[in-house]
Amino acid sequence: VNALLRHAPELEARMRARGIAVSTWTDVPASSGMAGSSVLVLAVLAALRAHYGLSDKRYNDYVLAEIAQRAEEEEMGVVCGFADRYAPVFGDIAYLSYHGKLWHAPLGDEPFVTYEPLGRFCRELQFCVATTGLRRDSGSVHAPMRARYLAERRAGSGPLLALARQMGETAWRGKIALLRGDLAELGRQIDRNQELVDAMMRQCGFTAGAGVEVDLLVRAAKDAGALGAKLTGAGGGGAIFALAPPGCEAQVLDALRAAATAAGLVDSEVFAAPVTARGLTVERAA
């Protein structure tokens, strides 16, 4: 609410004239690396916009995503980027460009994220998700990594900077593979991204890299035939997702459940995650 008030001064008078009670629920596992906190922040922002009749031109969905990032970073102390704030709003599987957004400038002083939906090219993709059931504050990972990365950017070189550039390459190569329908190559880019994330975390002092449990689930998915698998979220817990070959979703899901059980991950959840074009939706109760 505070973040929205800073950008929508007309909201304060409307809130004084007409109160609101907010209740929330979610089926996103907490601290699982699946944008659970961002989803709730975005839902509340969208509800406030609708309830108080704020302009959906001035406070469009891009602006809501930007305000959500600032709410989490400035109000909640979560060191974070923009992907988790844009994807829930716009939905679909997408290619994102963060050009010009490195320094987290005030709203309006840097570009919005470029969000390119690609779902119409790949509705047949079959993703499987497995959570470790282990909670971790993403900021505890992102804060030292971001500080190190910014220091190397200022210096003009460094190992983390080199790894990040390679990670960017996996994104555009993965996009090309997806558009071509080359799922094997898409899977290779997912795997390569996982290797680079693991290396980045080790560079920043996380001796287990992406995390023992994450590695275990990634291996289980790959051994079951997944074309690619990687963590989602900050690592050291959270979740992984895997790209299953057409018709092989069930065997990958079964393998992930078996691996989680064998590892004693009693709070693990395993489920299919089909690509959907639907993003943020506001529904009014009668």
Protein language model annotation of sequence segments:
Residues W25-A35, E72-V78, P159:
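A short glycine/serine-rich beta->alpha loop
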Residues G33, A239-F241:
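Short aromatic/hydrophobic contact patches that present stacked aromatics
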